[in-house]
């Protein structure tokens, strides 16, 4: 620090820089690393945080179509609940991609729960109108398996770092400025993935953890992105 100002240091460069360490961020980091890319994953708190690893429960429930014939109904239900705000292409990608994604997680060795005890098979998902296929990712197992895989693939983990700004050059994002509270660092990248979650904790009454504060949306907006589908879910 000089004259009351922090110096900006070049920390590192990589092919893919991932901001956020929930399920989306972890999945992006693993997929990029498996393709041969060098990956840095940055998270404000600890690894495995946010709503994906909500501390008030044992795991994360995953809802999908009961079978192929149920896909159209689930797509329609999501779009109806979304009151016209849902992107049809993204809805279809979710519905058609959820089972392959679940199988990939299972093949990695992560323990998944199935509905079947105490009337669980009779439960209807929130905002839905019928029974669907349900699987639950057990957090303890996910942390163990994902940590091992991230290490095997050589993903660099920078936890306890706050992202302050996305850096642009020639009309594209080329890196980010982060801080550990004592120093400023620039991380350069060829591609950047924002997986920082939602913004539910900005509201006085919310169910999510305090780190779900809209950081990614603010960074993206400042970098010139257009925000869509901004409605609170937690």
Question: Where are the regions a protein language model picked out?
Answer:
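Extreme N-terminal leader/targeting segments of oxidoreductases
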Residues: 1-16, 34
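Core beta-strand elements of the Rossmann-like FAD/NAD(P) dinucleotide-binding domain
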Residues: 11-14, 182-191
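N-terminal Rossmann-like FAD-binding beta1-loop-alpha1 element of flavoenzymes
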Residues: 16-41
């Amino acid at each position: 620090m000089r004259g009351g100002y922090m110096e900006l240091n070049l920390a590192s460069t990589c092919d893919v820089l991932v901001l956020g360490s929930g399920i989306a961020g972890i999945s992006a980091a693993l997929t990029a690393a498996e393709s041969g890319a060098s990956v840095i994953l940055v998270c404000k708190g600890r690894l495995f945080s946010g709503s994906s690893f909500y501390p008030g429960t044992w795991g994360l429930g995953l809802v999908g179509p009961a079978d192929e014939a149920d896909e159209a109904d689930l797509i329609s239900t999501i779009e109806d609940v979304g009151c016209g705000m849902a992107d049809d292409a993204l809805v279809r990608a979710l519905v058609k991609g959820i089972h392959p994604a679940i199988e990939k997680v299972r093949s990695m060795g992560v323990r998944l729960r199935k509905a079947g005890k105490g009337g669980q098979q009779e439960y209807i998902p929130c905002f839905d109108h019928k029974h669907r296929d349900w699987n639950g990712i057990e957090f303890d197992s996910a942390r163990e398996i994902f940590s091992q895989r991230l290490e095997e693939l050589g993903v660099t983990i920078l936890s306890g770092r706050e992202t302050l700004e996305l850096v642009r050059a020639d009309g594209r994002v080329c890196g980010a400025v982060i801080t550990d509270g004592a120093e400023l660092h620039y991380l350069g990248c060829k591609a950047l993935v924002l997986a920082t979650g939602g913004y539910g904790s900005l509201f006085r009454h919310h169910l999510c953890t305090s780190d779900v504060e809209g950081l990614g949306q603010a960074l993206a907006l400042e970098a010139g992105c257009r925000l869509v589908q901004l409605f609170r879910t937690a």
